[in-house]
Amino acid sequence: MKEEIMNQTNVKIGQLRDRMKELGIDAYLVPTADFHESEYVGEFFKCRHFLTGFNGTAGTAVITMDKAGLWTDGRYFVQAEEQLSGSEIKLYRMGEPEFPTLDEFLEEELPVDGCLGFDGRVVNSELGYGLQNLLQEKNVTINCSKDLVGEIWTSRPAMSCEPIWSLDVKYAGKSTVEKLSDLRDAMKKNKAQIHLMTALDEIAWLFNLRGNDIVNNPVFLSYALITQDEAYLYVQKEAIKEDTKMGKEVCAALAEAKVQVKEYAEFLQDVAALKNAVC
């Protein structure tokens, strides 16, 4: 059974390399992340687990044309050794001097004029620009437009879309109207025209809403865009069950706060359309 799993892992790595070769990508990075930098991620976002077979909550995989590595911390050394055993993936123990760091590995393995790929939706700007600066001496380009693991993950679970529900103000402390007013005051002080939100816990707090899109975390997949006059909440609209008591309460609460609901998938294109705004 274990041998079969390891063979499947090596097959997946081979499939990924085929796509990398087609696109001219020399190394592909797969973090443990969703679109919101959540500490824990839903099943849809477990690309690193799918690719490597390692199911710890922290770790980053890098695949090149002839090497495959997983970086994780001391909490997971024993587990990772067991789950990677028999595959071609090497465990790089973070914090131990005999193992290169992720940065050191990329500096060494990427060729001059090479290309590093990753899904830019799950890599934050700090890491992305850091990698760009790290590799600029080798004139390495970044391709952040491809979810290559998603392309080979034919049985990928659907993105979670559990019902959203409203938290009573007696538990929330302040109404959404009050919280938006406080936020807009802070925006004025900082001369910000637009406030973008991507962290799920912060969005749930601001709008006094809760969900169950990540196990044991009362959050829902969402973004928010706030101006002095408007507030937009981006969610999967199917998560607001308007024909149920719970859904009607959500709609009423958002209407009271003059919050407009938009489709989750529209957020990135709306942000791309922003021009000359101070965020």
What do these predicted ranges mean?
Residues 2-110, 123, 127-273:
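N-terminal accessory/capping or targeting/presequence segment of soluble
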Residues 114-121, 279:
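Acidic beta-strand-to-loop metal/phosphate-binding motif
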